[in-house]
Amino acid sequence: MENKIKEYREKSGLSQGKLAEKCNVSRQTINAIENNKYDPSLQLAFDIARTLKVTMEELFISEKGGK
């Protein structure tokens, strides 16, 4: 699933490592999600959205072309 995690993470001034720490995952997990190589669990997706202070709809792009 495509996402805008990197965009919102950078706007928030967080490194991959800091976001990972706040979400209790590895930096490699955040990197893989940002590069569309791994789809996060629903709980992790909510944790990332909450940490970045955005909605799930803002963060993730539907594969059907919607936002």
What are these regions (language model features)?
Residues 37-47, 66:
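Short, basic-rich loop-to-helix N-cap that marks the start of a DNA-contacting helix
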Residues 58-67:
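Short, charged recognition helix plus adjacent turn
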Residues 43-58:
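DNA major-groove recognition helix of helix-turn-helix/homeodomain DNA-binding modules
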Residues 3-22:
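Short basic helix-loop element that most often maps to the first helix and adjoining turn
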Residues 25-38:
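Recognition helix of helix-turn-helix/homeodomain-like DNA-binding domains
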Residues 18, 29, 58:
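Residues in the helix-turn-helix
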